Each structure stands twice: as structure tokens, then as C-alpha cells.
């Protein structure tokens, strides 16, 4: 039987035999990428992201599932003077047929990742999150009864809730920021029975998020000229680039990559600063001179990753370079105006990160960076929280344990081991 896909090291070009690998066994500092046997996008009869099952690294769908929706808005187009603006929305809005009850496009990556891990050995994923990713995995855990370990900064605990009581979530709150949560999660992933979710290195995560571009291309009949999104790690933007590469290989949706227009939230803008000088590596003293305080000031905490997959082979630097991309620094005031614009024209309360992306589009339209008749895709990566609260009861997730930012010791691992044993 011909395998559905294989994975290849982007930097070295070699095929990696172990499809569970998160890194190149030859030692290249590089992401791995899926290569699907089917070069043509074949739509399935399933709903949500599994409509694009042929380009997801799983053999069966996880149902029921939601997915991104692509639509246009005459009102928003008129407001910005952009005649061919399309919106990709991953959140909750029954009027727009959007059914992600965690309110975030992180649900797209969680669906693909949970199903893939289940198929590859039923390991329990350990996820570090600034809020949205953790909520997505917790929400699907509650829906499907699959155990997950979520590690978040203490400040993000309030952003973790589900619409079904979560019985299978081990939540660790870390007194620190997102980078500290990543360090703790790395240690916990060594507990037997657990496995690191992988972040940007996880091909299922990227291919799941890439369905936003697949859905847009199918809906519009072509790859858009421009793609707008706010980024913290930039994994979603890498996913958009990779999805576009596959669509070009298909041959029916165009031959040109979309230009990536990516935004960060002032005053924390390390990717903006590094890309302005076309540097592949960060200089912390220039790009993150006062990171702890800068992170506290942003309106969108999920955009504050201090260690994004920027310089790694196949990472965000390469995506920006390949697409002649542009970075935008968006102030909180601009973000709030972007939030009001989406609310007024689409009737959706957007996630703050999506408001930042909208503000970047406003900047680009005003500067003439995008033309009035260009095909543009704005990725509204989350929203609809007010409607979720109207339609569902929300169940907050209480931490199983709270630790300091330097805690990676045996006591914490032993507590997790006891919890994991219930699923053995």
C-alpha cells in the first residue's frame, strides 16, 4: 500500500523515515514538511477541516469537527476601498456558518494533532500555550474524551474554558510568561506516556492551520494575492505559505505565492524589528530590550512569543523571504480601532490578535501597499466569544497544579505520572 504522505527535512532535503519525528535526525536546524501522495486537492464529503482530509497527516477524520469559513463583506470592502477582499474566519458565528466553539483557529491545529497522535500510538500531548491553543486542546479533550496536558502562564488561566465539562485535562499554571510555560512543558513531555505536541515542528499543527488557505482557494477559485494575519510564533503564517505551495503544485489555483503581511502588537515586536533588517537571527538587546514589561503592555498576549520559529530552516524568515513578505507594528489604539471595524461591519467580536491583523490591513490600504483590486485574504483567527457565552454554558478549567517558572523537578513529574496512569 502506498503511504498517504512522507516527511522531508526542508533544509537538508532528506526523507525522514520516522513520521513521528519532530526534528531532522541528520541534525539540520530545520522544520520537517509533509509531502502528500496526492498532488491534487481532493475534497472529501466530511465537514470542517476534514473536507481537506487528503492534505492532512491523518487517515481518518475526527468528527464532528468545525473548520474555517471564507466569505466576503461588501461593508468592510467599501470601508477599506478594497473590491476583492475576502475574510477567513475561524471562530463562532452561526450567521457565518462558523462553528468553532473555542473561538479560535487554534482548534484547527488541535483537531489534526489529536487525531494524528491517537493514530500513532495514543500518546498524551503536552501543550504549552499563551491561552488560545490551550483552550482549543482542552475544548476538544472535553468533546472527545481524549486526555491532554496543558501548560500556561498563570495570567492565561482565565482564558481557559470549555463548553463541555473537561474531565481529562491536566492544567499546569506557571508563574511566568509563555516562554517559561514552554520550558516547563518540555520537561513534562519526558514523563512516560506523554509526548511533546511539538509547536511549529508539528506537521499536523501546520497542516491543520493551513486549511484556512485551502478553504479560501476553493471558495475563491484561486490563491489570493495577499494574506494578512497577526503572529506570535508565526506558525499559522508558515502554514499558509506551505498550503499555497501545495496549491501551486495542484495547478488549478494559480502559480504565484500570496504575499504574507504579518503583524505584531506594539511594544513587543521582535519579528518586525529583525525582518526590517532582514536578519535571520534575533538580537535580544535590539529586538526585545525590555521583553517582560513590553509583554505586559500589549492588548493581545497570544502574540508575545520570545522564541518563535523564525530563523529555523523552513521557518518564518524563509516564509517571508519566499513571499516577499512585509511586517507591521500595530499599536493598541490601532488594534482597538480594528476591533471596532470588524464588530461594526461583520457583527463579530474578534479576538484581539485578529483586531491587530485588521489594523495592519488598514495600514496597508492607506499606504497603497495593496491595490484596490488586488485579491486579499484577511485571516480573522478568532472571535465570537460573546455569542458563545449566549449559546453555551462556559466551564472554567481550574489548574491541577501551580508552579514557579523554574519548576521542572521530580515532584511535578511524579504528580503528572500518577494522572497519566489513569489512562494506561
Curated annotation (Swiss-Prot):
Belongs to the threonine synthase family. Cysteate synthase subfamily. This is Cysteate synthase. One of its GO terms (molecular function) is pyridoxal phosphate binding. The keyword Cell division does not apply. It catalyses: O-phospho-L-serine + sulfite + H(+) = L-cysteate + phosphate. Pyridoxal 5'-phosphate binds at residues 132, 381. The modification N6-(pyridoxal phosphate)lysine is found at residue 106. Keywords: Coenzyme M biosynthesis, Pyridoxal phosphate, Transferase. It is an enzyme of class 2 (transferase). Gene3D superfamilies: 3.40.50.1100. One of its GO terms (biological process) is coenzyme M biosynthetic process. Its EC number is 2.5.1.76. It comes from Methanoregula boonei (strain DSM 21154 / JCM 14090 / 6A8). Its cofactor is pyridoxal 5'-phosphate. The keyword Secreted does not apply. Pathway: Cofactor biosynthesis; coenzyme M biosynthesis. NCBIfam families: cysteate_syn. Homotrimer. Specifically catalyzes the beta-elimination of phosphate from L-phosphoserine and the beta-addition of sulfite to the dehydroalanine intermediate to produce L-cysteate.
